[in-house]
Amino acid sequence: MNGSRAWRLAAWLLLCLSCSAAVARKDSCETCTKLVERFHKGLENTAKKNFGGGNTAWEEKTLSKYESSEIRLVEIIENICDSSDFECNHMVEEHEEQIEKWWFKMKQKYPDLLKWFCIEAIKVCCPSGSYGPDCLACLGGSERPCHGNGFCSGDGTRSGDGSCRCKAEYTGSFCLECSDGYYSSERNDTHAVCIACNQACKTCNGPSNEDCKECNNGWVKDDGKCVDLNECASEESPCKDSQYCLNTEGSFLCKECDGSCSGCSGEGPESCKDCATGFVMLSGKCTDVDECDASEKLCLRENEVCLNTAGSYKCTCSEGFEDKEGNCVKIMETENPEITEGETGTPASDTNILNTAHEDL
């Protein structure tokens, strides 16, 4: 392996190790934070489990012994992690002595378990507004990371680089500049408020369409302000022949013509340019032609009638007839008389003989 290739491989391995360590530090802080939350939940559960019986004097006397007892700590720790949560169980096992130390010796002086355990004792988290192995202040300061307009990378963890991920309205390293589509209503060295431009503006320096620096798509400059461009007014429609154009603010919609139309300028049969097959123009709108009223008979089979439909017609068998092999034939009722209860199908003469024989016995 030549020297250049070996150097690149070493640099790649170093980068991978660095990334893995950063992820591990972030995950460790998340695990510790969750562990502390579960610990506080355990405090609530053990308090409810052992008290609240109504004997206040007895509870106060007993509580003073139980609330900081080893028994209570064991009950909490036994239920602090799910059995499948490897990271949580590993952290408890690795740092159980620290938890016991806080419980028996440090709790009164340092009541904030997250701060004492996660930040100061095992050093997997940072105070809010700081980041990285040394808990450096985020850009903009730990009190208002990213000047309150974004999120600090690694905030509260031992990972990240402290850079700002700005909210949609803001941009820049410190989240003090306004993004396209927003203008600055307040601004100083440490504070900025960005408000959305008028919908007509792509960029602006104020709230109205007269304050646009550049118009958004679908708007054009007219007399110093951005106004809606009516795409539907162009000579060539942006829609298909079977659709009409409907202008909207900054855009347009293509909507299907009425079924009676062959091309249209708007909604309904009165907006047809031409009528579709099966329709004729009457009183300014396309109306269905009733082909069944024509003098020439359209349905020629015996026992067949004509039914008008929108824009057409269909031939169907008359009531009481059905189509069989191209002919309308009468529907035959099936003869299937029901056998009444008690009937056996035995001939009457035989039945009488049987009855007679039975009577003779």
Curated annotation (Swiss-Prot):
Subcellular location(s) of the protein: Secreted; Endoplasmic reticulum
Superkingdom, taxonomy of origin: Eukaryota
Region (Disordered): 339-361
Signal peptide residues on this chain, from the entry's feature table: 1-24
Glycosylation sites: N188
Keyword Cell wall biogenesis/degradation among record annotations: no
GO MF: calcium ion binding
Domain EGF-like: 134-176, 288-329
Gene3D superfamilies reported for this sequence: Hormone Receptor, Insulin-like Growth Factor Receptor 1, Chain A, domain 2, Laminin
GO cellular component labels: endoplasmic reticulum; extracellular region
Keywords: Calcium, Disulfide bond, EGF-like domain, Endoplasmic reticulum, Glycoprotein, Repeat, Secreted, Signal
Annotated disulfide bonds: C138-C152, C146-C164, C166-C175, C292-C306, C299-C315, C317-C328
A Pfam family reported for this protein in Swiss-Prot or TrEMBL: DUF3456
FU repeats: 191-238, 251-298
Record field: compositional bias (Polar residues): 346-355
Task performed by this protein: Possible role in neuronal acetylcholine receptor transport.
PANTHER family given in the database record: EGF-LIKE DOMAIN-CONTAINING PROTEIN, FIBRILLIN-RELATED
Protein name in UniProt: Cysteine-rich with EGF-like domain protein 2-B
Origin organism lineage: Eukaryota, Metazoa, Chordata, Craniata, Vertebrata
